[in-house]
């Protein structure tokens, strides 16, 4: 029955039935922490002592017999019985027994618990004993105690006295007790004297002899012996407390005489006193034990005797053991058995024990009890006995010979015939019978025992010339290698030649001989080479067999190893060290196996030495890629050293690699190592104080603000730690989900197999089990891989082939056990595992009955490994049955969908969704999938299903469900887009609109019933034609949203926050599910644990900024400030930090839970997990944590007032952002009344918002008058004031004061640009020097101004400025290299010379970023430009000249390749010189990776110019593909890509998700070049062609009909367009089968398409025909190619283009059922709005492009470039972004425009 169902059933019964009875019954079905806690809670509230005792007895019984219960009880709240339930004597006894077994749970009792304990005697005593808390903290009244309580009290008091010696207050209390207290006083007071008669036997250990009047030294003999072993007041031997001192040393002989004859005293003395551990004492004790067996403690003393091999004591032990063997009585056997665990096991001792046990086993075979005891001993100590196997088998076989001889002699004496075969005579196949007694003794199967030990048996039989063994040729051949091994080990190698084996025979048995020899430590390669040739070559040639044999010996006969297995592996590595592929692919699985399996028997140092040795054979890049599987065994220091990490990003890459390792190490181990590395990087270990948690918080927060790349990487780490469920996730939990993957990638069970053939299934299985291998089941994995490879006919990938090659010849074996058929597959009470098991058995048997035997052979091992493996097999089998027409699987699905509300295991429902995806959605009904998706809250699956259903029928209720799903995944653009679909929004549409606006009060009113015509209330939902299933009831779903977002909850929490203003400790009572409020609770926790209040407030301010200065959070922080201020006012005599120390101390006393130290104690950041918490980065004028972080400032707050001031300013900005002018003015007025003049700046910004520029200037002037020039606020105000004045004088005056403001220089430069270009150029340069954020706009302007200068004086001045700029900021120039390079063609010689110097410096310092881009000028058609480049190249250093020469040679070869006319090409045959050029010290274009080689394959594309795709192999081992193009000018494409990179940088500053898909373009000349190849791209035409062809429709044929007219025209348009019904959306379903990846890909497509539409409109990009727009099948991204038709050139074509961008019916169709509404329109508007805000940057970066003399528009007329720039400006003048987007969309989709487009543009698809 379903576990959750049972648990809920028992929890319900607990409410009405006797809890102990219900619990007893529940334990027979399940063990649940929830039930245990519920029972404990009831027991705490109940007063019935009998029922409590009954419950505790049940606990004790289950603790003994149920391991799971032990673990669950440990984690439960059972300690509440101690702290909240009064105990009696019986319950005390049983609960004490529970604590003895389970251990105490670490808690610090609060005041109320302390008070409870003081009033309940038994609880108090148990707490003291269980928690070892023996501090004197309560003066109990002992006079009222009964006898039992008094004895308990005395025991407790003695423990308290021991822990509180010399405590005067305790001594005074003891004196008041109504009992004999002399012993207690003697313990507490060292100077207290006591009579010897009052001391008990155990009391002598707790007092000094000097305290005792009339003491006898013999009385303290044991105390003296314990004091010899005392450490920290405890005896190391017996564990007694030894508090006394000053004992007199006793004489050894006197002591021996005194204990003579007393075995117990002798054993006590031996265990405590080394002087008496003599052979004589050993003999005495052994004699005494064999005469009169003593208690177990007497035997334990034998462990202290130093028994050495061949020593006197060993001889003594052997003498007694031989005596026992000779008598062999049961008593002697018993004594020997008791001695066995405590005697040192030398080989002779172990063998003697074997003789006793084995002979006893045979002699007393009828005594089953004794036989079982002996067998248990032999089994537990098998490894020890196996260590002396040679002695054992020699003894046994000699005994067999003697026995057989005796039998034969008796037969002869009795006159038997000699011709009769003797019963002792055995053939090879009868050896099992011969060794039957021995195999039974070791509890092994006979044949297996003989087979595993033949290594010893055969050489002994051979050496003894075993008389009753008939030679068997096959037996001899199979086992003679054991004889050879034996001869090697005995050093009798010369005898091997005498046996008569040939060299080939010896060579064949080499593996069988060498592995046992290596295991026995035989490494004489010189000797072995005589028989097997070069040993290392032999190992290399037979590596798979070697590894297999080594593992087989290790698993089956681990006792054969005389040396560490790692030493043997080292020998193997030495043999194959030159072959990295073998080292990793062949060897690593076995290395990994031994790493895990050899955990206990091998020390850590041994492993480390081996790992270092093994890893030394890998190059650094290979190590970083692969050694994350070894890193968990290393410390952080070694990981850093081996990986050669140089930055935080490198560390994060390693951490991500660690967390990505699957199947190799436990996830806990990987996460622990990841945390260790994170602590090393961000925990400031350099301070010398270990890990500093507050520093960690601060470091992560600062880096988070500074770097987007850091946010992405640290977010990835956080996501993976969260997936692992590791506690370490809290370390970086502040990272928003905006920077995390919202869902893990699809599992293998979600992979779509297009054709369910055996080979297709096998390919998935092989990849799955190679990369997710469990070392614990390694052999099973290897067996499955081996068997699965038989079904794969074609080749695998190169990487896969390297890995699986070793399994193509292995011989792993597993005996298949047929599964039993089942009738019923599913019941609603089934667990997921049981469901899968029954489904697998049913479907496998159905397949077996059919004709699909090949599938059966492949899938019959599905139940051998984990659940995921079984699930994949079930999916495959179900698909086969569904395709064969089986209806039982569909019936099962229907039953599951109908039982969703009755407790179905969610994993079963999830399986149905996986099956739906696995079968491409062909068999299961959409309605069933929809119900299951909503039940599981799998909104991505629901969205995919709903859109599929809406495409069939556009029902409003389906749109309602779709709107709910989009709201649930926080895709608010689409939520609002659905509202735009309907002309008249429904109440449901309004509901979601209000929810998006966070107006939950208005949303709730949408759910209220509305009155009907007769006053009767009607439901607000619409179109209720039938009762929908509960999980699809929109009204219920909407109510759930409201329940989670109650305004009442907000109000309640805000009111609760007010309580902390009077009592800060009230923060611990705050609770909320709201992310903002959880953030605030975490802030309070930070404050409560702070050691430096001001530093903590600084961190809190940073956290608040990261959360976007949320309004509710700001209000909560106001309460926090009030709370801190009230505490400071109450303790005004103390400093802030001193007050906090007091606060921290008070909290510790008031906290129940223990605050553990270390990384796992402070969950600083986990409240930032909601994407709603994060907004776009704050504006740069913000004075706060972010600005200080970006500027590198480390100064924080110096007072609480500063924190409060920043808080008020943030509130004002928040109101201003919401246009709440009234409240904004109110807050500003409040701060002005308090003379907080910093608010004047915010007042000025408010004035600007209202259009009151004059008032804004006045406010800013006041700021400038009040604040010093050094303050940040003064600088901000001055910049803003100058910007509002916008005059040359204002900027000049401001710059005379503020000489380091990049923004001010940038603003001023624009003002001077038209009149004073030299001054403007200087200001632009200064803007970049002081703030590199200005470089995107300033650098292009600098070079444009310089190139436009005409007077020589201006040119000379500009040259000086550029020289200064180059010296200070050359590192910023590589991204603008193409813009700078184009100036080399400048007609002015002086300008060109200056540019040449800059180009030279860039080429010299940044060769990898400039050489490839320089080719266009080196091959220029303009002689002067070419000559200038030659001059630049001649000045380069020799190394750079060589590298550039190689780049040029490579480009020439690539040009030759592009010109080839052949249809098929290979490098080796057609371009052998090119293939041999590498390595040439040249980087792959656009990377830092060196080209190490080139692939042989060259792909030729069948188009007009026949471009070729080639592949470079990088030094990092990766492939880099490039397309070589001929007769194609790529210069404009290259410059267009430069612009796209600038746009991407703008997008990144505003949002983390928007981007343009770019690729590298490297022109070599005006007619050739290379383009970076992006794999997986398909053109719109190719995609549509595929789907229309399925319906028999041809795009090409349709287009050909209109070639003559070159366009369709309005008359034919509608007929043609209606024929091509949109199909593009199907491509997303087929390319991205998983619903999550499908939605992500479609969002990527929509967003990238919208962004490129705005870019294309702005740039006047035309020629967007169906083959120039491509789509990535890996991500869904849009990629545009052939970007040379720009600046409105499309309107000048023979058939002018009439649309701003392509928005045909297939394009719109693929946006989803919402069409243009939602994501597309939002992305379009926001991108256009971004362009409007950054038009200066965009136009600046187009200046060099437009004014480049190489392009045709510059050659037409000198005024053309200026007109292009003016047109670009005018495009963005006085625009309303959304209105303009509507106009553009209308133009792009207008039929009248589309019908007039050129037919080759394919406007109809």
From Swiss-Prot:
Catalyses which reaction(s): L-seryl-[protein] + ATP = O-phospho-L-seryl-[protein] + ADP + H(+); L-threonyl-[protein] + ATP = O-phospho-L-threonyl-[protein] + ADP + H(+)
Pfam families listed in its UniProt record: FATC, HEAT_ATR, PI3_PI4_kinase
Location in the cell: Nucleus
Region (Catalytic loop): 1660-1668
Domain FATC stretches: 1773-1805
Primary location class: nucleus
EC number(s) given by UniProt: 2.7.11.1
GO MF: ATP binding; protein serine kinase activity; protein serine/threonine kinase activity
PI3K/PI4K catalytic domain location: 1494-1793
Keywords: ATP-binding, Chromatin regulator, DNA damage, DNA repair, Kinase, Meiosis, Nucleotide-binding, Nucleus, Serine/threonine-protein kinase, Transferase
Region entry G-loop, spans: 1500-1506
EC primary class: transferase
Record-annotated FAT domain positions: 928-1420
Annotated spans, Disordered: 406-425
Family annotation (SMART domains): FATC, PI3Kc
GO biological process: chromatin organization; DNA damage checkpoint signaling; DNA repair; meiotic cell cycle; telomere maintenance
Organism domain of life: Eukaryota
Main function: Serine/threonine protein kinase which activates checkpoint signaling upon genotoxic stresses such as ionizing radiation (IR), ultraviolet light (UV), or DNA replication stalling, thereby acting as a DNA damage sensor. Recognizes the substrate consensus sequence [ST]-Q. Recruited to DNA lesions in order to initiate the DNA repair by homologous recombination. Phosphorylates histone H2A to form H2AS128ph (gamma-H2A) at sites of DNA damage, also involved in the regulation of DNA damage response mechanism. Required for cell growth and meiotic recombination.
Family affiliation: Belongs to the PI3/PI4-kinase family. ATM subfamily.
Protein's name in the database: Probable serine/threonine-protein kinase MEC1 homolog
Naturally occurring in which organism (per UniProt): Encephalitozoon cuniculi (strain GB-M1) (Microsporidian parasite)
The gene coding this protein: MEC1
């Amino acid at each position: 029955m379903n576990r959750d169902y049972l648990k809920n059933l028992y929890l319900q019964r607990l409410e009405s039935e006797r809890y102990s009875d219900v619990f007893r019954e529940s334990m027979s079905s399940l063990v649940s922490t929830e039930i245990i806690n519920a029972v404990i809670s009831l027991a705490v509230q109940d007063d019935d002592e009998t029922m409590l005792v009954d419950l505790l007895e049940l606990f004790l019984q289950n603790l003994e017999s149920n391991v799971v219960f032990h673990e669950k009880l440990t984690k439960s709240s059972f300690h509440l019985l101690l702290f909240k339930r009064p105990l009696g004597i019986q319950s005390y006894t049983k609960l004490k027994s529970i604590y003895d077994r389970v251990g105490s749970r670490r808690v610090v009792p609060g005041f109320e618990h302390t008070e409870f304990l003081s009033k309940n005697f038994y609880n108090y005593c148990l707490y003291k004993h269980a928690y070892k808390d023996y501090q004197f903290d309560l003066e109990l009244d002992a006079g009222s105690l009964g006898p039992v309580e008094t004895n308990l009290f005395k025991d407790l008091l003695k423990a308290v006295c021991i822990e509180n010696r010399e405590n005067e207050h305790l001594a005074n209390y003891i004196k008041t007790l109504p009992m004999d207290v002399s012993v207690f006083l003697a313990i507490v007071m060292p100077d207290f004297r006591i009579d010897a008669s009052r001391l008990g036997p155990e009391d002598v250990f707790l007092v000094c002899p000097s305290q005792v009047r009339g003491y006898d030294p013999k009385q303290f003999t044991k105390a003296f012996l314990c004091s010899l072993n005392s450490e920290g007041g405890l005896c190391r031997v017996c564990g007694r407390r030894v508090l006394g001192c000053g004992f007199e040393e006793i004489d050894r002989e006197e002591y021996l005489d005194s204990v003579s004859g007393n075995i117990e005293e002798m054993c006590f003395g031996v265990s405590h006193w080394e002087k008496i551990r003599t052979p004589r004492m050993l003999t005495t004790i052994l004699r005494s034990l064999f005469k009169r067996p003593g208690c177990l403690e007497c035997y334990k003393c034998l462990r202290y005797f130093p028994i050495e091999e061949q020593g006197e004591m060993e001889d003594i032990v052997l003498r007694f053991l031989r005596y026992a063997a000779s008598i062999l009585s049961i008593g002697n056997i018993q004594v020997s058995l008791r001695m066995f665990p405590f005697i040192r096991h030398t080989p002779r001792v172990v063998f003697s024990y074997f003789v006793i046990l084995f002979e006893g086993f045979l002699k007393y075979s009828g005594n089953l009890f004794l036989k079982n005891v002996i067998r248990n001993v032999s089994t537990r100590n098998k490894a020890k006995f196996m260590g002396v196997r040679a002695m054992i088998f020699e003894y046994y076989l000699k005994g067999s010979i003697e026995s057989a001889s005796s039998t034969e002699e008796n037969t002869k004496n009795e006159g038997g015939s000699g011709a009769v075969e003797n019963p002792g005579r055995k053939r090879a196949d009868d050896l099992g019978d011969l060794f039957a007694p021995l195999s039974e003794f070791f509890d092994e199967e006979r044949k297996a025992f003989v087979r595993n030990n033949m290594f010893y048996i055969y050489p002994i039989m051979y050496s003894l010339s075993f008389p009753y063994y008939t030679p068997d040729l096959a037996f001899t051949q199979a086992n003679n290698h054991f004889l050879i091994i034996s001869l090697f080990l005995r050093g009798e190698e010369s005898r091997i030649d005498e046996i008569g084996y040939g060299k080939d025979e010896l060579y064949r048995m080499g593996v069988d001989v060498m592995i046992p020899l290596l295991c026995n430590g035989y490494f004489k390669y010189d000797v072995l080479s005589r028989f097997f040739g070069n040993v290392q070559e032999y190992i290399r040639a037979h590596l798979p067999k070697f590894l297999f044999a080594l593992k087989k010996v290790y698993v089956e006969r681990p006792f054969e190893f005389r040396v560490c297995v790692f030493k043997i592996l080292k020998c193997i590595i030495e043999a194959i060290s030159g072959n990295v592929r073998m080292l990793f692919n062949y060897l690593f699985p076995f290395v990994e196996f031994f790493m895990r399996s050899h955990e206990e028997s091998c020390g850590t140092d041994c492993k480390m030495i081996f790992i270092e040795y093994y890893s030394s054979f890998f190059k650094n890049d290979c190590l970083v890629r692969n050694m994350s599987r070894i890193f968990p065994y290393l410390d952080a220091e070694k990981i850093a050293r081996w990986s050669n990490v140089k930055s935080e990003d490198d560390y994060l890459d390693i951490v991500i690699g660690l967390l990505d390792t699957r199947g190799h190490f436990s996830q806990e181990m990987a996460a622990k190592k990841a945390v260790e590395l994170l602590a090393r990087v961000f925990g400031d270990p350099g301070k010398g104080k270990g890990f500093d948690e507050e520093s960690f918080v601060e470091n992560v927060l600062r880096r988070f603000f500074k770097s987007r790349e850091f946010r992405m990487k640290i977010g990835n780490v956080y996501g993976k730690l969260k997936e692992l469920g590791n506690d370490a996730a809290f370390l970086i939990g502040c990272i928003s989900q905006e920077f995390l993957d919202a869902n893990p990638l699809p599992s293998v069970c979600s992979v779509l197999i297009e054709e369910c053939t055996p080979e297709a299934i096998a390919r998935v299985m092989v990849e799955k089990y190679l990369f997710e291998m469990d070392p614990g089941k390694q052999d099973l994995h290897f067996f499955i891989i081996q068997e699965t490879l038989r079904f794969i006919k074609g080749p695998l990938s190169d990487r896969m082939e390297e890995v699986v090659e070793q399994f193509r010849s292995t011989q792993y074996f597993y005996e298949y056990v047929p599964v039993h058929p089942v009738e019923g597959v599913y019941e609603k009470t089934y667990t997921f595992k049981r469901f899968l098991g029954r489904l697998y058995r049913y479907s496998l048997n159905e397949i077996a009955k059919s004709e699909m035997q090949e599938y059966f052979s492949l899938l019959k091992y599905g139940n051998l490994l984990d659940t995921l493996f079984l699930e994949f097999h079930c999916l495959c089998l179900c698909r086969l049955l569904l395709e064969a027409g089986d209806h039982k699987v569909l019936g099962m699905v229907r039953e599951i969908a109908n039982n969703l509300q009755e407790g179905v295991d969610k994993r079963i429902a999830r399986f149905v969704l996986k099956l739906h995806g696995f079968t491409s959605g062909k068999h299961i009904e959409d309605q069933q999938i929809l119900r299951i998706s909503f039940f599981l809250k799998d909104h991505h699956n629901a969205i995919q299903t709903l859109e599929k259903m809406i495409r069939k029928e556009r029902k409003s209720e389906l749109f309602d469900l779709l709107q709910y799903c989009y709201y649930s995944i926080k895709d608010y653009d689409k939520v609002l887009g659905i509202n735009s679909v309907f002309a008249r929004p429904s109440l449901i549409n309004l509901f979601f609109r209000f929810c998006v606006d966070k107006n939950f009060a208005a949303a709730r009113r949408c759910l209220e019933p509305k009155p009907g015509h007769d006053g009767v209330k009607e439901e607000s939902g619409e179109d209720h034609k039938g009762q929908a299933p509960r999980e699809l009831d929109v009204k219920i779903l909407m109510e759930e949203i409201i329940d989670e977002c109650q305004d009442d909850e907000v109000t309640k929490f805000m009111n609760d926050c007010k309580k902390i203003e009077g009592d800060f400790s009230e923060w611990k009572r705050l609770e909320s599910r709201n992310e903002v409020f959880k953030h605030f609770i975490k802030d309070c926790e930070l404050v409560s644990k702070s050691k430096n209040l001001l530093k903590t407030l600084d961190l809190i301010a940073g956290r608040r900024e990261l959360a976007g200065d949320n309004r509710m959070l700001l209000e909560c922080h106001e309460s926090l400030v009030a709370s801190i201020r009230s505490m400071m006012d109450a303790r005004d005599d103390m400093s802030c930090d001193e007050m906090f120390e007091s606060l921290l101390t008070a909290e510790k006393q008031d906290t129940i839970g223990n605050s553990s130290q270390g990384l796992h104690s402070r969950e600083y950041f986990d409240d930032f997990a909601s994407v709603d918490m994060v907004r776009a980065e704050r504006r740069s004028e913000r004075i706060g944590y972010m600005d200080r972080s970006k500027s590198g400032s480390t100064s924080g707050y110096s007072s609480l007032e500063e924190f409060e001031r920043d808080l008020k300013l943030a509130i004002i900005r928040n109101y201003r952002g919401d246009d709440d002018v009234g409240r904004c003015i109110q807050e500003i007025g409040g701060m002005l009344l308090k003379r907080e003049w910093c608010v004047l700046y915010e007042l000025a910004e408010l004035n600007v918002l209202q259009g009151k520029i004059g008032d804004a200037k006045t406010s800013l002037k006041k700021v400038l008058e009040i604040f010093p020039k050094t303050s940040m606020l003064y600088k901000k105000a001055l910049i803003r004031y100058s910007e509002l004045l916008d005059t040359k004088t204002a900027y000049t005056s401001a710059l005379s004061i503020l000489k380091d403001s990049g923004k001010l220089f940038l603003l001023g430069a624009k003002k001077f640009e038209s009149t004073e270009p030299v001054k403007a150029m200087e200001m632009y340069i200064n803007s970049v020097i002081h703030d590199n954020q200005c470089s995107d706009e300033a650098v292009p302007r600098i070079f444009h101004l310089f190139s436009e200068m005409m007077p020589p004086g201006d040119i000379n001045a500009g040259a000086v400025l550029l020289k200064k700029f180059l010296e200070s900021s050359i590192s910023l120039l590589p991204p603008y290299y193409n813009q700078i390079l184009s100036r080399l063609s400048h007609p002015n010689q002086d300008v060109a010379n200056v540019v040449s110097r800059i180009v030279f410096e860039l080429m010299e310092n940044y060769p990898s970023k400039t050489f490839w881009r320089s080719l266009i000028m080196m091959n220029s058609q303009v002689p002067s430009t070419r000559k200038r480049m030659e001059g630049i190249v001649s000045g380069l250093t020799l190394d750079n000249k060589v590298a550039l020469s190689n780049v040029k040679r490579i480009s020439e070869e690539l040009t030759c390749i592009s010109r080839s006319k052949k249809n098929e090409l290979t490098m080796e045959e057609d371009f052998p010189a090119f293939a041999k050029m590498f390595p040439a010290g040249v980087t792959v274009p656009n990377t830092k990776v060196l080209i190490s080689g080139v692939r042989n394959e060259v792909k030729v594309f069948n188009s007009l110019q026949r471009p070729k795709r080639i592949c470079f192999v990088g030094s990092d081992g990766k492939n880099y593909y490039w397309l070589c193009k001929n007769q194609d000018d790529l210069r404009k494409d290259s410059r267009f890509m430069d612009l796209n990179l600038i746009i991407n940088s703008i997008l990144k500053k505003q949002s983390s998700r928007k981007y343009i898909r770019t690729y590298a373009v490297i022109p070599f000349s005006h007619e050739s070049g290379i383009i970076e190849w992006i794999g997986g791209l398909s053109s719109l035409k190719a995609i549509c062609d595929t789907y229309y062809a399925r319906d028999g429709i041809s795009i090409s044929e349709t287009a050909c009909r209109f070639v003559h007219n070159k366009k369709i025209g309005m008359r034919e348009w509608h007929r043609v367009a209606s024929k091509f019904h949109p199909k593009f959306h199907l491509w997303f379903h087929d390319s991205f089968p998983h619903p999550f990846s499908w939605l992500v890909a479609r969002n990527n497509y929509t967003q990238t398409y919208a962004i490129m539409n705005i870019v294309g409109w702005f740039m006047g990009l035309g020629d967007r025909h169906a083959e120039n727009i491509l789509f990535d099948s890996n991500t869904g991204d849009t990629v545009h190619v052939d970007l040379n038709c720009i600046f409105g050139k499309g309107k000048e074509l023979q058939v002018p283009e009439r649309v701003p961008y392509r928005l045909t019916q297939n394009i719109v169709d693929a946006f989803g059922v919402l069409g243009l509404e939602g994501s597309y329109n939002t992305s379009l508007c926001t991108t256009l709005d971004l362009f409007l805000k950054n038009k200066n940057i965009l136009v600046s970066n187009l200046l060099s492009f437009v004014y480049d003399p190489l392009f045709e528009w510059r050659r037409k007329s000198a005024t053309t470039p200026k007109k292009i720039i003016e047109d670009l400006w005018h495009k963005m003048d006085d625009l309303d972004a959304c209105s303009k987007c509507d106009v553009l969309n209308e133009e792009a989709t207008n039929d009248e425009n589309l019908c007039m487009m050129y037919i080759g543009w394919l406007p109809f698809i």
